[in-house]
């Protein structure tokens, strides 16, 4: 043990600096010198080693004696032999220690005399206590000789003083190649790398949309099957696709078009036979330009493009190695089966139901709750193993800590201009152990800088550079170009100079006490307040409206000189319509510094705080309501109260059945009055829109129709109030729903919402395509023919509905039908029974001397008021308002008009009794005689029973009945000459009897007789 310790070389103190000294170069003499100095060391080591070994062997012998017991007791000879053996063993061991190198592996055996042993023993005894330290035998000055160390230090200092260029030169000389490479060191300009006409052409080939990538892979596989050097190689150079807006085409690079045709021959989803597009040389670089993809990092923010989570904010959890897919964490939207349709057919949950749009009606954002999921979908809920987090699997999706963990493709995400709002990001803050939420504002601010748009910085905004080479510069923006902002430095050594900085390195700079306005990106938009604290990218301000502190990002603020007291409080202004609760709205009538004074829909005034307002209702300029008379009222119309104070004003807001109007004559409540729509009438409409009744109906001159040269009837005026089409059963005449029946549920001016019987669905159909039908009989009902025709004669039946009149044959018991057999009504031709009245031709009893007439009998021709022929009414003194009363009345057969029930046959006439003075213009008698159609005679007169038997005399000088053209009887009350008066009893020049204007201008109803008129 002592020998090993003494053999170690601890070195000098100067050797501490270097543990790996370079090997020293020594000569042969130095080796000999070292051998001489080492020899006494070896002898001393051998002696020390022998003593130690002897002591150890003695101990071993004692142990052996104890173990062997009494086997060797008293045997002294054996002990002596063992001692001799020990001495023999120790001697060669002592000599082996002295040899180094290869001699350590060679055994030396030599005979030793006892004399030599005795001499050695004597030497050992003499040298006991005179042992020397190894350093004692070193030459003088050897312990201070550190030349090798100093030389190594000089080499290191020299290497440290060399600069990088010299070190690179030394390394190049030592390790560089001896031969120069055959390369061209000339720099080629990029413009010379652009394609030219000598390069291969690029052809655009039509393919099936969405199959571009598959076609390119098919081309690649075909090239592998027919490589260059084969019997029939593919001669194209490359093929690629661009997708997106350039879908439907693949692009093949080749020398000839024939090579492209050969490469794409008999390949599916591609159409090489169609016209190929040769890409111009100038457009080739744009076609091959690669757009740099957005780098996504865990912790960043993205938005979802489509589906139920469209435009929802999500946080990136993990990015795949290929960069094509990411794992995101977002707040789920679940209804836990509350809105499920139990009657819906069982379908694959992954397949979409037809007509269902999950983005239209989607549940609100809430963290996942296993308690809610267990209520209805317990069988779809399973707990999964997680690393200390609550992990659930619900309906095939994973939820951890209440968040949805979802794998999505990058193309389904919005990675640019995400602009996460602070309230959105707050939902992603995980709660720590002490109950506080830990929100990483640094990563959020970094995302906001990456998505900061150039419109966020306007000229004049105070900004500062917070990172980069220009960090610390303060100035104001002067212009923006893309993501580069030009800044005019206002502080520091560069004051007055203009520099450019990227948007990512800028942030807006505010000081405490600045008055700012929130411009966007936060739910506090349009808030005004004073800055009270600035911390990095977040600014805390005291709102002028709520007197509460709010924290927003500096990019969402802008210096503002506005105040929240002068007529406006933040986002609220006078005359704004606000929502107080689910059933109450109010209009702001006064704005104080910290409160709002509003007039609610019930007419009560209340003072509220801005925080009590649920939301501000955007004014609806297209809102429509109806007043007391059913007239349409809109925003901006002037209305007046019917009852009460009869106040008037301009409509500001329409909310359900309430109107908020502004009365300039009222000073209180800022002139705002709230009334119900049923208590107002329209005074004037905005923009001159007609709202009242059509005044043209009140002008008799405009209502005259039928006379030659007279005005045509005006188009039917717009009706107000409830539409008569509502609730009616209708039939669709044309279109995709032709032939289907339905009920009208709602109408507009030109369209109707019809609930179809067959499909049980609501469709919108134009009104002109609908026909009203009777729900029982299926007959067509005409509800749009105005106010109907004249009254039915007294001797006819009660008026029938508009769709029943004037049909032939018809067995119903009312008038205006031919033939009729069993009715007790008159005015039928021919008829065999009745009330015994005249007016039948031929008639066989009771006043049979009369010519057919549609009304009461005893006419033809007579002087009294009840015997005028022709006339459509049953009154003896009736008169018409038209020049064409004579021919438009009910004395003709056939006729179509709705004047009376005495026409045969007619297709659409009706015997309505609305007004006997309302005649139809331009009656079209059938078979088509001009103005009248005598039966059975022809044009020019209506002799009865025929042209050959005039009554009461011959044709030339007699008075045929009803007369040539017409016999206007009775006359109207002196409205001037009639162009078609029928002179009686002769055809020329005599006074008409009882012609038009027979009564003159008087109104007493008595006949007037002139000279030349025969007496009755």
From Swiss-Prot:
Q: Where is the composition biased (Low complexity)?
A: 933-946, 981-1000
Q: Print the keywords alphabetically.
A: mRNA processing, Nucleus, Transcription
User: Keyword Lyase: yes or no?
Assistant: no
Pfam hit, one: KOW1_SPT5
Supply the InterPro entries for this chain.
Answer: KOW, KOW_Spt5_1, KOW_Spt5_2, KOW_Spt5_3, KOW_Spt5_4, KOW_Spt5_5, NGN-domain, NGN-like_dom
Record region (Disordered): 1-149, 341-363, 780-865, 894-1016
The record's listing under CDD domains reads: KOW_Spt5_1, KOW_Spt5_2, KOW_Spt5_3, KOW_Spt5_4, KOW_Spt5_5, NGN_Euk
What spans are recorded as compositionally biased (Acidic residues)? 10-29, 51-88, 110-128
Query: What terms describe the molecular function in GO for this protein?
Result: mRNA binding
Compositionally biased spans, kind Polar residues: 793-802, 901-916
The entry's localization annotation reads: Nucleus
**Could you state one GO biological process linked to this protein?**
transcription elongation-coupled chromatin remodeling
How does this protein assemble?
Answer: Component of the spt4-spt5 complex. Interacts with RNA polymerase II.
Q: What does this protein do?
A: The spt4-spt5 complex mediates both activation and inhibition of transcription elongation, and plays a role in pre-mRNA processing. This complex seems to be important for the stability of the RNA polymerase II elongation machinery on the chromatin template but not for the inherent ability of this machinery to translocate down the gene.
Q: What name appears for this protein in its UniProt entry?
A: Transcription elongation factor spt5
Gene source species: Emericella nidulans (strain FGSC A4 / ATCC 38163 / CBS 112.46 / NRRL 194 / M139) (Aspergillus nidulans)
């Amino acid at each position: 043990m002592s020998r090993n310790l003494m053999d170690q070389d601890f070195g000098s103190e100067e050797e501490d600096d270097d543990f790996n000294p370079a090997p020293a170069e020594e000569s042969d003499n130095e080796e000999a010198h070292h051998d001489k100095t080492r020899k006494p060391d070896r002898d001393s080591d051998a002696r020390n080693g022998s003593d130690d070994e002897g002591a150890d062997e003695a101990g071993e012998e004692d142990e052996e004696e104890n173990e062997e017991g009494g086997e060797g007791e008293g045997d002294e000879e054996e002990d002596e032999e063992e001692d001799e053996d020990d001495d023999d063993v120790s001697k060669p061991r002592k000599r082996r220690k002295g040899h180094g190198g290869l001699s350590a592996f060679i055994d030396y055996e030599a005979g030793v005399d006892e004399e030599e042993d005795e001499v050695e023993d004597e030497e050992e005894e003499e040298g006991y206590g005179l042992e020397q330290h190894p350093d004692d035998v070193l030459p003088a000055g050897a312990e201070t000789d550190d030349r090798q160390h100093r030389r190594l230090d000089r080499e290191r200092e020299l290497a440290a003083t060399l600069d990088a260029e010299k070190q690179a030169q030394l390394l190049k000389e030592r390790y560089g190649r001896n031969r120069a490479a055959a390369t061209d060191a000339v720099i080629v300009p990029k413009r010379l790398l652009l394609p030219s006409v000598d390069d291969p052409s690029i052809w655009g080939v039509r393919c099936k949309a969405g199959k571009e990538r598959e076609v390119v892979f098919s081309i690649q596989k075909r090239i592998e099957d027919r490589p260059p050097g084969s019997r029939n190689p593919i001669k194209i150079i490359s093929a690629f696709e661009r997708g997106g807006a350039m879908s439907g085409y693949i692009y093949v690079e080749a020398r000839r078009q024939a090579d492209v045709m050969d490469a794409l021959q008999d390949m599916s989803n591609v159409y090489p036979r169609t016209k190929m597009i040769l890409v111009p040389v100038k457009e080739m670089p744009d076609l091959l330009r690669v757009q740099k993809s957005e780098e996504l990092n865990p912790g960043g923010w993205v938005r979802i493009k489509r589906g139920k989570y469209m435009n929802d904010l999500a946080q990136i959890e993990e990015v795949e190695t290929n960069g094509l897919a990411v794992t995101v964490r977002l707040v789920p939207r679940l209804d836990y089966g509350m809105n499920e349709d139990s009657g819906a057919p069982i379908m694959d949950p992954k397949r979409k139901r037809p007509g269902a749009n999950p983005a239209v009606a989607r549940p609100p954002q809430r963290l996942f709750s296993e308690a809610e999921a267990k209520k209805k979908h317990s069988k779809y809920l399973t707990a999964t193993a997680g690393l200390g987090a609550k992990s659930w699997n619900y309906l095939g999706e994973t939820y951890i800590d209440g968040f949805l963990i979802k794998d999505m493709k990058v193309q389904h995400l919005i990675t640019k201009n995400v602009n996460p709002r602070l309230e959105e990001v707050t939902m992603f803050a995980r709660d720590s152990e002490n109950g506080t939420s830990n929100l990483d504002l640094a990563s959020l601010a970094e995302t906001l800088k990456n998505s900061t748009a150039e419109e966020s910085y306007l000229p004049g905004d105070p900004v500062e550079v917070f990172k980069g080479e220009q960090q610390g510069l303060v100035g104001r923006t002067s212009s923006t170009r893309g993501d580069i902002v030009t800044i005019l430095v206002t502080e520091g050594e560069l004051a007055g100079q203009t520099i450019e900085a990227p948007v990512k390195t800028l942030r807006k700079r505010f000081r405490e006490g600045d008055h700012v306005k929130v411009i966007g990106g936060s739910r506090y938009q349009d808030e005004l307040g004073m800055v009270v604290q600035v911390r990095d990218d977040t600014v805390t301000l005291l709102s002028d409206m709520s007197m509460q502190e709010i924290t927003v990002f500096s990019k969402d603020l802008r210096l503002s000189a506005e105040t929240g007291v002068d007529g406006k409080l933040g986002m609220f202004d006078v005359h704004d319509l606000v929502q107080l609760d689910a059933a109450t709205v109010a209009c702001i009538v006064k704005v104080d510094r910290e409160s709002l004074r509003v007039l609610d829909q019930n007419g009560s005034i209340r003072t509220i705080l801005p925080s009590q307002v649920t939301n501000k209702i955007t004014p609806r300029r297209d809102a429509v309501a109806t007043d007391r008379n059913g007239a349409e009222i809109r925003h901006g119309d002037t209305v007046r109260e019917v009852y009460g104070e009869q106040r008037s004003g301009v409509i500001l807001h329409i909310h359900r059945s309430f109107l908020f109007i502004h009365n300039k004559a009222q000073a209180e409540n800022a002139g705002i009055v709230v009334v119900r729509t049923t208590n107002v009438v329209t005074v004037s409409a905005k923009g001159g829109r007609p709202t009242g009744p059509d005044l043209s109906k009140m002008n008799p001159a405009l209502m005259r129709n039928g006379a030659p040269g007279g005005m045509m009837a005006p188009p039917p005026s717009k009706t107000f109030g409830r539409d008569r089409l509502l609730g009616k059963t209708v039939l669709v005449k044309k279109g995709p729903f032709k032939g289907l029946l339905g009920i009208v549920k709602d109408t507009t001016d030109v369209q109707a919402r019809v609930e179809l019987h067959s499909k049980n669905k609501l469709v919108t159909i134009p009104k002109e395509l609908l026909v009203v039908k009777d729900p029982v009989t299926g007959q067509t009902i005409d509800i749009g023919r105005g106010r109907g025709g004249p009254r039915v004669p007294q001797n006819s039946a009660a008026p029938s509905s508009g769709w029943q009149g004037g049909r032939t044959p018809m067995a119903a018991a009312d008038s205006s039908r031919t033939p009729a057999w069993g009715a007790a009504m008159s005015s039928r031709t021919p008829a065999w029974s009745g009330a015994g009245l005249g007016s039948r031709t031929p008639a066989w009893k009771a006043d049979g001397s009369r010519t057919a007439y549609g009304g009461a009998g005893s006419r033809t021709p007579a002087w009294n008021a009840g015997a005028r022929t022709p006339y459509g009414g049953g009154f003896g003194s009736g008169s018409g308002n038209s020049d064409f009363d004579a021919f438009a009345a009910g004395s003709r057969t056939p006729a179509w008009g709705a004047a009376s029930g005495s026409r045969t046959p007619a297709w659409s006439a009706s015997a309505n009794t609305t007004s006997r003075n309302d005649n139809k213009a331009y009656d079209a008698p059938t078979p088509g005689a001009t103005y009248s159609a005598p039966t059975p005679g022809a044009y020019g007169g209506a002799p009865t029973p025929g042209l050959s038997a005039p009554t009461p005399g011959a044709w030339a000088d007699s008075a045929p009945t009803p007369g040539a053209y017409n016999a206007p009887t009775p006359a109207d009350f002196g409205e001037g000459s009639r162009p078609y008066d029928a002179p009686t009893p002769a055809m020329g020049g005599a006074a008409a009897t009882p012609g038009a204007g027979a009564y003159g201008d008087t109104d007493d109803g008595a006949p007037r007789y002139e000279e030349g008129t025969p007496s009755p």
